[in-house]
Regions:
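Cytosolic, long alpha-helical scaffolding segments
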Residues: 1-254
Length: 254
């Protein structure tokens, strides 16, 4: 039990022994590649860092989706789409590897608090991977639109940009919260952004029916458009699930 008080000190020592690699696009695990550590608490801390990195990289993946929307050159588009596809595949692997590590930790002797932590962290990992899936779904919709001979109207682009900004705000807030060790990040901000996303989706859904009927754009472009808007709303739901899992365990710890 004495070791618990020195977890932070041991953690710093381990980080010096196992230096962090430079960020790359391989989505390689950084903190739990060496197997289980001397205590369950220290192993959980390392898994926490891996989840934080997973969240950051998924946020970066969404940034690629935003870039893809305005990439017109076919060669550049294909390269960026392939990069997003690669991120999605490795995101799947990260979910499995982190979950397997946490399940190994849970096989040991754990306090009730540690068991709650692991349960919440497993939920976080699942939902972060779902965010990666949503990013890939967005990229696939943009790809279908890119392969067609049609384009969104300026008004549609404006609405997509606004929805993308709300989604990016949600992801930024999520990353800040999962990395927050001192409970200073306001959880309610995430819920407020989610409400904004839901309300905006409903507004655009109703407006889309009117715009298609008024022949401002054809039905198929309306489908691509609403697929993007709807997927952003789903992504926002996954973000809130991560936030809830992370904030619940931190409340129990404090």
């Amino acid at each position: 039990m004495i070791l618990i008080w020195f977890v932070k000190l041991i953690e710093k020592t381990v980080c010096k022994i196992i230096p962090q690699r430079e960020q790359d696009e391989e989505y390689r695990l950084r903190f739990i590649t060496g197997g289980m550590l001397s205590t369950a608490e220290l192993s959980i801390l390392q898994a926490r860092k891996e989840i934080n990195l997973f969240a950051e990289r998924t946020h970066r993946m969404f940034g690629m989706v935003r870039d893809l929307l305005h990439t017109t050159n076919d060669n550049d588009f294909n390269k960026l789409f392939s990069r997003i596809e690669k991120y999605e595949n490795i995101s799947d692997n990260m979910e499995v590897e982190i979950a397997n590590y946490l399940n190994q930790v849970s096989d040991g002797r754990l306090s009730s608090e540690s068991k709650l932590q692991i349960r919440a962290m497993l939920r976080e990992v699942t939902e972060i991977e779902s965010i990666g899936d949503s990013c890939y779904n967005l990229a696939r919709t943009i790809n279908r639109k890119h392969r067609s001979d049609m384009d969104f109207t300026p008004k549609q682009y404006d609405h997509i940009h606004q929805m993308f900004q709300l989604t990016d705000d949600a992801l930024s807030q999520m990353v800040s919260l999962v990395e927050d060790e001192h409970h200073v990040v306001d959880v309610n901000k995430s819920f407020n952004i989610e409400n904004e996303i839901n309300n905006y989706r409903n507004q655009l859904k109703n407006q889309n029916v009117l715009d298609v009927n008024n022949k401002e754009y054809d039905y198929q472009m309306g489908v691509h458009y609403m697929d993007i808007i709807g997927e952003c709303e789903k992504l926002g739901d996954y973000v809130v699930n991560v936030v809830e899992a992370s904030s619940n365990v931190k409340e129990k710890k404090s």
